Amino acid sequence: GMRVKILEGMALGRVVVTTSMGLEGIDAQHLKEVFLADTVESFVEAIALCRQDATFARKISEQARNFILRHY
């Protein structure tokens, strides 16, 4: 089924960290519109990257919102 929470987060311009399974059916790309994290370590890395590089995190969130506007 459709991943409504992920799409809602993207539409709101939030940084989305999800698993590969959570992203199934959504053509967003890792490090472009979302962060993919399939292990605890990769979740921690994604969160740390967002905290360390707010500009990059903002870019991902803006691209996520634009993705939703283009595709949904």
Task: Please give the residue ranges for each predicted region.
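Short glycine-rich, flexible loops that bind phosphorylated cofactors or substrates
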Residues: 1-2, 25
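Conserved acidic donor-binding loop of glycosyltransferase catalytic domains
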Residues: 2, 18-20, 37-38
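Residue-level signal for the nucleotide or nucleotide-sugar donor/cofactor binding architecture
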Residues: 4, 38-39, 52, 72
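Short hydrophobic beta-strand element within catalytic cores of glycosyltransferases
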Residues: 5-8, 15-19
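A structural signal for short secondary-structure junctions
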Residues: 10-11, 28-29, 61
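A short, well-ordered alpha-helix in the C-terminal region of glycosyltransferases
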Residues: 49, 56-70
